[in-house]
Amino acid sequence: MSSSTTVFVSGASGFIAQTLVKQLIEKGYKVVGTVRSNEKGDSLKENLKAAKLQSENFTYEIVKDIAVKGAFDDALKKHPEVTVFLHTASPFHFNVTDIEKELLTPAVEGTNNALQAIKTHGPQIKRVVVTSSYAAVGRFADLADPSIPATEESWNPITWEQSLSNPLAGYVGSKKFAEKAAWDFVEKEKPNFTLSVINPVYVFGPQAFEIKNKSQLNTSSEIINGLLNSKPDSKFDNLTGYFIDVRDVAKAHIVAFEKDSIQGQRLILAESPFSTQSILDLIRKDFPQLDSQLPKGDPSQADAWKKAESKIENEKTRELLGFKFIDFKKSIDDSVAQIIG
């Protein structure tokens, strides 16, 4: 891929996507992003400019609702220069009333709409990368089982019906069924493009640009922000899982379309396991000035993930990508430094 390549990024104002757009511009790519409003598009352009990056290489198109049939048609018709499509747009929030209507259907339809638009209006597009989630791969929440490892071949066993039981199950289901839809599309339609899929775990790390509104961080960053806003006597849920840094998630999207060997592959982006307690312990150690304001929790529960999480085996992904992931300490420290800065 040369730097004259134009890359299409759906959902460009999302947490991962902003870092992705930033890295693409830094590497000399031209970027067409979709956003839900002019305000979001202008804000992203201004942020790129403020970061002294070539903001003229970023343009945006408005797609108010990715689940509407033909949502991406006009944007692709207007940009015949696009040869790579990175589909990051998907609903990710838990304040929903109708799980099927607000999470499951939009995720599946959004993916189908993007791929159908590429097939019909973007025959010159050769590479497509879809942002899925570890939720589509591994046994999650109630289904987690430490005795069953998760690999790039694994699928979450959740059913459509199980997905309707609560918003977290709805989110998990939306990721699984949207990713299934992408692979099914390629299988059935035999389009001009190759597909690869990125499946990140909990994504930590700093926002791409200076944070203007600290009350609205992405859902994963809220875990760190929630701890920083707690009081010494606050109680918290000791959440467990695996983490990956947002800068590595963005980088993986780029490597995924640049490298021939990654075409047709699923990648699991996970660096190491964590618990809310282990985040807290690290913050208190590395930011002693915050120690007196934070709860102590129960340090003996720092490795609670051992009993609660399926083991992730993603050696294949690491080998295909060929770069070393940012470690837990750097990811959390950089996140905290930005929030308190």
Curated annotation (Swiss-Prot):
Any one cellular-component term (Gene Ontology): fungal biofilm matrix
GO BP term, example: methylglyoxal metabolic process
Keyword Transferase: no
Class of enzymatic activity (EC top level): oxidoreductase
Subcellular location: Cytoplasm
Cited function: Catalyzes the irreversible reduction of the cytotoxic compound methylglyoxal (MG, 2-oxopropanal) to (S)-lactaldehyde. MG is synthesized via a bypath of glycolysis from dihydroxyacetone phosphate and is believed to play a role in cell cycle regulation and stress adaptation.
Miscellaneous comment text of the record: Has antigenic properties. Elicits a specific immune response in systemic candidiasis human patients undergoing malignant hematological disorders.
Record protein name field: Putative NADPH-dependent methylglyoxal reductase GRP2
The species this protein was found in: Candida albicans (strain SC5314 / ATCC MYA-2876) (Yeast)
Lineage: Eukaryota, Fungi, Dikarya, Ascomycota, Saccharomycotina
UniProt gene name: GRP2
